[in-house]
Amino acid sequence: MATVHILTQYVWPDAAPTGLYAEQLAARLEQDGRDVRLVGGRGGYRELQRKRPVARITHLNHYRGSRGNLRQSFTEYASVTRAFCDYIGRFVRHDDVVVVTSAPPNTVTLAQAIRRRGARSIYWLQDYYPELVRGLYEYPVPLRAVFRRFWDHHLGRWDRIVKIGSNLGGPTRNAVVIRNWPTMSFDRPTAPEPRTALYSGNLGYGHDIELLVHACGKLRTAGYRVTMRSDGRGAWQLPAWLQPMPLENDPAKLRDDLLRHEVHLVAANPKITQAIFPSKIWNTFAARRKLVCTGFAGPMIEELEISKLAPFDRHLEQWTDLIATAQNSGQPNRVERIEPALA
């Protein structure tokens, strides 16, 4: 039986968002009877208590930097990518399927290593880095164009790119849109506490902190009690009245937190519209809570409106169908492109 290898920087017991999605895809594939390996590094991003998702999890050795230290982070990115390349050379066989997430970003260069093994390659584009780095440094437009050409050249080498939203940059020729989904279930309807608002998650390079603080201020003026649970560099920039609490690391408490609040805040950056689409939105949709989105503009607003109608309970099935097609074809994956409005 051919193996599906899913490679991402952080895996269980860590709880980075990309890792959570990777493990839930792996668990579904294992449930369907497929041979699957979840492969990641040994670094730490975020804690969340949960049981082991699949039987076969491989943790690779690599340099581990300090989160928040850019030099160390980039060194870790390169080290993880080298470890992935070594893993591909040693363990990937002809006709296997290799799914690689955009964490770390350097993994965009791994398509040729997978092709040399005679396997099919799928790149899971959670973040489009030529645009995302603008949150760190607003580099000149000509340089941006050069970086995009370089990145898109490497993206074009993959048999298939899976974008999590129609707003993400990158080539379209080999791309399909399969959106993310709620990472937890909300089976029992629960009424929220009135006039409560919650931000829960990362505040990083793709977020306009000033716009988020302004929205929180308007809610506070309207009588809402605003709870801020966040990590990342943006958390350091919050005013004293919005000082963040730690993120919940117990899934039951996190679920209760999401259900208890009437309004969920989601942040973006209006200058950076092709880099990300916030995955936390899907838990809000599933919990049936009100959304207050800050920094959404252009393509992100369009993607938000599409996502409100998207059948998120089918998104994992779209993934398994795509992988089944890749495994059953003797050639690179040729499934029909899923149009953004229909994904």
Spans of features found by a protein language model:
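Carbohydrate-associated surface elements
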Residues: R42, I164-N167, I178-W181
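Nucleotide-activated donor-binding/catalytic signature segment of Leloir-type glycosyltransferases, i.e.
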Residues: S230-L258
